[in-house]
Amino acid sequence: MAESSEPPVVLLHRPPSLTFMDEILTREFRTLITDTSSSESLPSFFPRHASSARAFVISGRLPVTDELLSHLPSLQILVCTSVGIDHIDLAACKRRGIVITNAGNAFSDDVADCAVGLLISVLRRIPAADRYVRSGNWAKFGDFQLGSKVSGKRVGIVGLGSIGSFVAKRLESFGCVISYNSRSQKQSSPYRYYSDILSLAENNDVLVLCCSLTDETHHIVNREVMELLGKDGVVINVGRGKLIDEKEMVKCLVDGVIGGAGLDVFENEPAVPQELFGLDNVVLSPHFAVATPGSLDNVAQIALANLKAFFSNRPLLSPVQLD
């Protein structure tokens, strides 16, 4: 790639609160910053200010459509600060010759920690017990109902990638028996492999969802899966909300078809089914599994490394395969 006397123009789009990329990019590039609170629409802003932008850094879940890309004629690389890329029209990027990078393993430790935290919270009923004490009910009514032990649980992991592997290692420390379902069997994995999620659910007490959202994994956890998991079964989701048929999950939780759920992601964020709010066997968090200062610093460094590599014609650190 030809050298230029001026730094390349990089476009950064982010929510107003996520400023962690601003300084690191402006030190290296001519950076244009837009945020989700702007009164000017992106199709209006781009032609007037960003037509020369060669890189587009997205912090958040902006839908990247073919129509949006049409307003960025100079764009060559799309840098996502998320691992999931289901908000991007991959076919349009491929057709336009735009390469894509994602966050790689920047969030894996923190998401795995959150998954384990949700599982412990659901099984031991920690948030419900906290509310019981704060409300004064302990003094009024005595002991709180018992939770379930974590140790020894059979845990099925859906998606044994980086995050799924980290979840497995953490839960091994609790004496949990790990098995998994993934696109293909991992020859180096010591865990039992199930080729379909129905068998995984039938032979486990817990399902932890760590996989990407694709056409194949959309609603991978449906009513049949939850019925096989059983009345004491628990679902933990730190992947994507649409991995679960949310309406059926709500019915299963209310009717006692499954025993509980720990959810960091939802089908129509930030909307959450109100039926979940009154259930003590459900623990909710606002899609924050990835969000710690350490992980945000990690992803900023990965994004910067990808940009530097691209503009120096070196291999990318975390490329997304479009084939």
UniProtKB/Swiss-Prot annotation:
<feature type="binding site">
    <location>
        <begin position="287"/>
        <end position="289"/>
    </location>
    <ligand>
        <name>NADP(+)</name>
    </ligand>
</feature>
<keyword id="KW-0601">Photorespiration</keyword>
<keyword id="KW-0560">Oxidoreductase</keyword>
<dbReference type="GO" id="GO:0120509">
    <property type="term" value="F:hydroxypyruvate reductase (NADPH) activity"/>
</dbReference>
<feature type="binding site">
    <location>
        <begin position="238"/>
        <end position="240"/>
    </location>
    <ligand>
        <name>NADP(+)</name>
    </ligand>
</feature>
<dbReference type="GO" id="GO:0030267">
    <property type="term" value="F:glyoxylate reductase (NADPH) activity"/>
</dbReference>
<keyword id="KW-0520">NAD</keyword>
<comment type="subunit">
    <text>Homodimer.</text>
</comment>
<feature type="binding site">
    <location>
        <begin position="160"/>
        <end position="163"/>
    </location>
    <ligand>
        <name>NADP(+)</name>
    </ligand>
</feature>
<dbReference type="GO" id="GO:0051287">
    <property type="term" value="F:NAD binding"/>
</dbReference>
<feature type="active site">
    <location>
        <position position="269"/>
    </location>
</feature>
<dbReference type="InterPro" id="IPR006139">
    <property type="entry name" value="D-isomer_2_OHA_DH_cat_dom"/>
</dbReference>
<feature type="active site">
    <location>
        <position position="240"/>
    </location>
</feature>
<comment type="similarity">
    <text>Belongs to the D-isomer specific 2-hydroxyacid dehydrogenase family. GyaR subfamily.</text>
</comment>
<dbReference type="GO" id="GO:0009853">
    <property type="term" value="P:photorespiration"/>
</dbReference>
<dbReference type="Pfam" id="PF02826">
    <property type="entry name" value="2-Hacid_dh_C"/>
</dbReference>
<keyword id="KW-0521">NADP</keyword>
<keyword id="KW-0670">Pyruvate</keyword>
<dbReference type="InterPro" id="IPR050223">
    <property type="entry name" value="D-isomer_2-hydroxyacid_DH"/>
</dbReference>
<dbReference type="InterPro" id="IPR006140">
    <property type="entry name" value="D-isomer_DH_NAD-bd"/>
</dbReference>
<dbReference type="InterPro" id="IPR036291">
    <property type="entry name" value="NAD(P)-bd_dom_sf"/>
</dbReference>
<dbReference type="GO" id="GO:0016618">
    <property type="term" value="F:hydroxypyruvate reductase [NAD(P)H] activity"/>
</dbReference>
<feature type="binding site">
    <location>
        <begin position="182"/>
        <end position="184"/>
    </location>
    <ligand>
        <name>NADP(+)</name>
    </ligand>
</feature>
<keyword id="KW-0323">Glycolate pathway</keyword>
<dbReference type="Pfam" id="PF00389">
    <property type="entry name" value="2-Hacid_dh"/>
</dbReference>
<dbReference type="GO" id="GO:0009854">
    <property type="term" value="P:oxidative photosynthetic carbon pathway"/>
</dbReference>
<comment type="function">
    <text>Catalyzes the NADPH-dependent reduction of glyoxylate and hydroxypyruvate (HP) into glycolate and glycerate. Mostly active in the presence of NADPH and glyoxylate.</text>
</comment>
<feature type="active site" description="Proton donor">
    <location>
        <position position="287"/>
    </location>
</feature>
<protein>
    <recommendedName>
        <fullName>Glyoxylate/hydroxypyruvate reductase HPR3</fullName>
        <ecNumber>1.1.1.79</ecNumber>
        <ecNumber>1.1.1.81</ecNumber>
    </recommendedName>
</protein>
